[in-house]
Amino acid sequence: MSNPSLLILPGDGIGPEVMAEVRKIIGWFGDKRGLNFDVSEDLVGGAAYDVHGVPLADETMAKAQEADAVLLGAVGGPKYDDLDFSVKPERGLLRLRKEMDLFSNLRPAQCFDALADFSSLKKDIVAGLDIMIVRELTSGVYFGEPRGIFEEGNERVGINTQRYTESEIERVARSAFELAMRRSKKLCSMEKANVMESGILWREVVTRVAKDYPEVELSHMYADNGAMQLVRAPKQFDVILTDNLFGDILSDCAAMLTGSLGMLPSASLGAPMANGRPKALYEPVHGSAPDIAGQGKANPIACILSFAMALRYSFDQGAEADRLEAAVEQVLADGVRTADLLGTEGVTPVSTTEMGAAILAKLDASL
C-alpha cells in the first residue's frame, strides 16, 4: 500500500521558515511513529511568479489535484504590490481554492490556557475556548452575479449579489454536521433569515439536513447576534456554520479571542476523492509577514497545527493529531514563546527553529 501524498507549498515571506519546522515534524512521525508520507514541494505566490511569471504554474495545480493533501505556508509581499491583479501572489491561493472546489473552510479558534492573558477579553471568558467555524467558501456574495460598478443616471452604483443554491448550502451543512459528530454534537447555524431571502433558504436547508443527524443539537442565530455572543460568551459555541461573507467576519472575530494569529491553523475541504479522502488545503491564518521574514522571529505553531489538522481530517490519524497538539500546548505551558507571544514575566523567548525543536522534544517525551 502506497504512502499518502502531501504537497508542500512554502510560498513567500515567513512561509519557508515555518514550513521548514513542519518538515522536521513530518519526518519525526515517519521515524518515530511509522507514519510516512510521499512529500513533494513546489512554488506558489510570489515565489512562483519569480520563476514562472504566474503565481501558480499549471504543473503545480495538477500536483495539487492529485495530492491527498496540500499544505501551504503564506503568499504575498510588498515586492509584488505593483503587479497586475491577475498575477498577484494571492491569485495562486485563490486558484487552488477554486479549481480544487474547496467549499468548506474550517477555522478553529482555540485558546490555550497558557495564552489566555493575551486575549483582549477577560481570562475567565476565553480560558478553555475551543470553537470551530465552518465557512462556506466558494459561493455567496463574493462570487454571485451580477456584480460590478455601473453608471445609473447621474451617478455610479456598486452591485454585489448574494446567491446560494440548495445544493451549495447542503454540502457545506453536511460538512459541518459531520464535524459536529466528531466533536460535542452541537452546531449553531448563523445567517440573516430575518432580512435576507438567502438566509431563509439557508435556514430551511440546514434544518432539513439536521434530520439526518439526530444526535446533533442544532440551533439557529442571526449573524449579528452571533458576533455579539462570540464576544459576550464564546464558550457557549462549539461548531458554528455560516456563509461566505458572515464566515469571513465571524472567523476573524473569533480568531482574536485567542490572542495571536500566529497560533491559528485552517483547513479548506472539498468533495471526497476516489480514495474517500476529501480534497484538502491546509494553511495558517497568518500572512507572509515580510517585515520579519528571514529573522528567525516567525511563530511556526499555526503551520504546525495546520499539519495536525491534516493528520485529523485527511489522514484519519486523530490520535497522532492529538499527540502533536498536546506537544504544542505543553511547550506553551512551559513558557516558551516566539516574539509575537512575549509580554509576560517568566517566559523564555525563542527563535523559529528553537520553537520547532521544543515541540519535537515534547513529541519525543510522549513516546
UniProtKB/Swiss-Prot annotation:
Q: Which GO terms describe its cellular component?
A: cytosol
Describe cofactor binding as the record notes it: Binds 1 Mg(2+) or Mn(2+) ion per subunit.
**Record pathway:** Amino-acid biosynthesis; L-leucine biosynthesis; L-leucine from 3-methyl-2-oxobutanoate: step 3/4
Tell me which UniProt keywords the record has, alphabetically. Amino-acid biosynthesis, Branched-chain amino acid biosynthesis, Cytoplasm, Leucine biosynthesis, Magnesium, Manganese, Metal-binding, NAD, Oxidoreductase
Q: Which residues bind Mg(2+)?
A: 224, 248, 252
List ligand-binding residues for substrate: 97, 107, 135, 224
Q: Main site of residence?
A: cytoplasm
Q: At which residues is there a site annotated Important for catalysis?
A: 142, 192
- What Pfam families does the database record attribute to this sequence? Iso_dh (PF00180)
Which GO molecular function entries does the Swiss-Prot or TrEMBL record give? Answer: 3-isopropylmalate dehydrogenase activity; magnesium ion binding; NAD binding
Q: Catalytic activity annotated for this protein?
A: (2R,3S)-3-isopropylmalate + NAD(+) = 4-methyl-2-oxopentanoate + CO2 + NADH
Needed cofactors, names only, are: Mg(2+); Mn(2+)
Q: Where is the protein localized?
A: Cytoplasm
Write the Enzyme Commission number(s) for this entry.
1.1.1.85
Biological process terms in GO annotation: L-leucine biosynthetic process
User: What family does the database annotate?
Assistant: Belongs to the isocitrate and isopropylmalate dehydrogenases family. LeuB type 1 subfamily.
Q: Which NCBIfam families does UniProt cross-reference here?
A: leuB
Name of this protein: 3-isopropylmalate dehydrogenase
Q: What is the lineage of its organism?
A: Bacteria, Pseudomonadati, Pseudomonadota, Alphaproteobacteria, Rhodobacterales
